[in-house]
Amino acid sequence: MSLETSWENTPASAGHKASMSDGYDFSALRILVVDDSFHMRELVRTFLEGFGIKEVTVSSDAEEAYDIVVGMDPDLIITDWNMAPVSGLEFVERIRKGANVPNRFVPIIMLTGYTEMKRVEEARDAGINSFLAKPISAASLYKRLVTSVQDKRQYVESTGGYFGPDRRSPKRRDFRGKERRDRE
């Protein structure tokens, strides 16, 4: 399922702030939830199923989740940061750089209690699309879902090894000068 085409004629596409009363049809989405906490996995699963999502797959560790991504090709991934032996950050980097991942462009929401700016930047630099701080609510998760699928940012690959959503500020997208990132 193409996330972009499934959202073209929704209120959020016209600049409307998403709320759970908007009545989005999430039923065809396939979402992978990765968290080592059983209670958090079940909470997120319950919220997602409450939003009408029929296919929610859960994993308790990033190694297993990577294998699931390769076989499932989810429409969206929600992952915790602090997991062992592979962290959520390493999981995101592996997806973005993965040779056998069916869709390196899959939207990824990082779900974590780590909210320091350094951590947010680190997650962004790993290639996440959105950041959601714990504790979560149904409303906050819903807004991140809508934001993630509505996000029109292009994906970029840098010579420094980054692959993921364009990290430049959306306020600067109308920049008309010479792009310093352009290759000669």
Predicted regions and their residues:
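Two-component/phosphorelay signaling modules centered on CheY-like receiver
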Residues: F38-T57
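Active-site beta3 strand of CheY-like receiver
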Residues: M72-I78
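Helix N-cap/capping motif at the beta->alpha junctions
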Residues: V58-D67, G88
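C-terminal output helix
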Residues: I136-L145, V149, R153, E157-S158
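Alpha4 helix (beta4-alpha4-beta5 surface) of REC/receiver domains from two-component response regulators
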Residues: R45, E90, R104, T115-S130, ...
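CheY-like receiver
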Residues: D22-Y24, Q150-E184
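Receiver (REC) domain active-site loop signature in two-component systems and cognate sites
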Residues: M83
